[in-house]
């Protein structure tokens, strides 16, 4: 079954995180939403395997953002995509290999508070399998992060940032 949603998206995702039993695979460009972060930490604490792919940029690594070192310490798996090579603009999540959420929704406060966003959910096996294979392909092309550090905003050299 396929369903489309245009509101209450954060709560839909939270519900699926809480219902997951085995694994969660997440590929989102940006992740700043603390409620979703806390929910995936809770999933790890329940024994759920969580794998996360994010863009390696200031939004995901700034000193005021989410502390992914806690996520790693709890046993979460993390890969960053080099934003200088490609803009990984995906926004999807697989729950236990049989439910997919995808759409325009980044896991950010802006997506929740300001943006007009949408998602679809599906349990169609062929679609979930396609996304599982795509996630595995993305993951296998990256290096898993074992240590996480934040970027201080004051350390960014504006000229270099604008040239990239």
Model-identified regions with their sequence ranges:
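PLD/PLD-like phosphodiesterase catalytic module centered on the HKD motif
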Residues: 1-26, 33-164
